[in-house]
Amino acid sequence: VRRSPSLLARLTGVVAGAVLAAAAVTAVAAPAQAATLTQVTNFGSNPGNLAMYAYRPDNLPAGAPAVVLLHGCTQNAAGYFANSGWQKFADQWKFALIVPQQSSANQPLSCFNWFVEQDITRGSGEALSIKQMVDHARNNYGTDASRVFVSGLSAGGGMSAVMLATYPDVFAAGSVVAGLPYRCSPPASTSTCQYSGVNRTPQEWGNLVRAAYPGHTGPRPRVAVWHGTSDSTVVPANATELRDQWTNVRGVSQTPTRTASLPANTALEVYGNDDVRVYRVSGMGHGTPVDPGPGAEQCGTAGAYLLDTICSAYHDAVFFGLNGGTGPNPTPTVSPTVSPTASPTASPTTSPTPAPTCVTASNYAHVTAGRAYHSGGYAYANGSNQRMGLYNTFYTSTLKQTGPNHWVIGC
């Protein structure tokens, strides 16, 4: 047992009234198939004393993405895996799921220790244990090291922010569901930001993330934030502070570049070039949004802290680029500038300039026809990489061809 009795005694008093997801989730039976959630042992030194579970869909190809799922307090790996909706899309789009499990030996309510110094520091504790699980999946399942993502609920959402901050070289993107910003509370105190929020400037929030791995020079992860407007367990102010933290980390404004209305009274705010998303679910309490049903964008099983509203797993999977897109945050294609080669002077042949090829169609049709591609739920024009809007049949764009496989918006 890693925790001293005195620390456990102090933590028990603090967290007793601060349950981040205070009811165990009952696992439902898995579909009749060979693939099952399986416990993995000996995945590393495991300094955080966590259990590892993994799910590999049938016929998982080499180089598949991987998503880490982090449950809430008093929940477990099997229950969150079975009910959160992620298994459906892992089967459909072929990516692995890594599901860490906390224990009461570490924390009385089986909460991930998103506020304990040794567990939120790069290279130690629970953060390192989770990173070792990712390494194990890469080495043993052949997952793609460049397409690793994380999503967590409540205390797991707080730990999701920890992983994004401490291991930006491991995670390409992540989502924080009913969670909290990285280092929003002093060590061993859950109540500071949980119940009232902590108001810091975006720069102050961003500095906390950058200090988690100061030697990192590569890109920082993209982040999606989910929160119910009626959440009284982790107050909604934390969603705004998360937005401030990660927009600053990504170097974009705290003013949204686009907003949209989604089902279940969900308001979506998009920041930068889809760097950060914030989903505010009107009237929803504390939990992971699910939407049980057979529809393409439905998922999950409703229950305690799994709230029947909208399928967050679907939207996160699309945001991560797991639905067949090119991956998050596509890098624009840059064509080198070529100096023309001088040739003997000749009388030019004059020919009429042809009218440009312009096509108006749904964004889905543009992608299907090869005039555009999709990534993170959005369509982008081939060649120019201009964002056209949501990738679906309802958004319509006009594209003009300006060169071989090069299209721009407008005509």
Regions found by a protein language model. Give the residues of each.
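A domain-start/cap signature at the N-terminus of enzymes
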Residues: 2-17, 22-66, 79, 84, ...
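Short substrate-entry loop that stabilizes the transition state in hydrolases
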Residues: 60-108, 184
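Conserved alpha/beta-hydrolase "nucleophile elbow" surrounding the catalytic nucleophile
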Residues: 71, 152-154, 228
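Primarily recognizes the serine-hydrolase "nucleophile elbow" in alpha/beta-hydrolase
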Residues: 82-86, 137-140, 145-218
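Cap/lid segment of the alpha/beta-hydrolase catalytic domain
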Residues: 101-125, 187, 290
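Alpha/beta-hydrolase active-site loop
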Residues: 118-141, 162
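Short beta-strand/loop motif that positions the catalytic acidic residue
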Residues: 225-227, 231
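Tryptophan-rich substrate-binding surfaces of secreted polymer-degrading and adhesive proteins
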Residues: 329, 341-411
